Amino acid sequence: MNRIMEVVPNFSEGRNMEVIEKIVNCFRNRDQVKLLDYSSDKDHNRTVVTVVGDPEALKAPLLDAVKVALENIDMNQHSGEHPRMGAMDVCPFIPVKGITMAETITLAQEVGTLIGNLDIPVFLYEKAASSPERENLAKVRKGQFEGMPEKMKDPAWKADFGPKDGPHETFGCVAVGARMPLVAFNVNLDTNDLNVADYIAKRVRHIGGGLRFVKAMGVELKERNIVQISMNLTDYTKTSIYQAVEMVRFEAKRYGVSVIGTEVIGLLPMAALIQSAEYYMGIENFSMDQVLETRIME
């Protein structure tokens, strides 16, 4: 493919494997579309799917997946640790090869229109946002599914596509956007005290005076009896994974808490891992040209 777009739809189902497989199957065996990865989390009750393909070819499988979510996920019955406002909660498009950000925004608008035609309210966010207030996903999703009926009464929060005055009664709303690649990364702690995780997340995230390009929140993992700091690094070239991990480690020491593991959610650029390898291994004068796979792909 000469033109490659990535899309990472997030679905509010992480426990029912039958429904998850129905959703993921929408992206299998499609012309000019490749399913790269999908991962589900029971505590978050969420599934993240990573797909690449020709921009036009991505539309049909995405609409099929929305329809599966519409038929099988009732947000009135949904619970989970991750903020959410819809059955397909977010759908970011990321340009990979031969595609400009302007074209990515146009695709987000086109897909948003198609989803809106299913009587589902659609909010554009990040680079595709229709106003500065909607660039930040956290602001768009504030109130979550339960709070959207009241929120959408405000003229400032009418949907960009689909019904303007309230969410779909079972599906809720969806945010469709255009952005550059980000790293979804979690740090697990050896405590079950959510207050500790919330404090650390507040110190680490940019909005709380922490690291630039980091969004973070504390999450309770009940099945494992621990908590984690769930993070999005929106520009890993400016704030790296190791910087985020080390700040979490530093703040955790205040409470006598240790980092016991980390998790990568979905896919991430190789360069993001190389940064951390250089730091922790103390590699001097390293170049991506020294990575075997990089040279093979040239």
Predicted features and spans:
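Long, contiguous binding/interaction regions
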Residues: 1-298
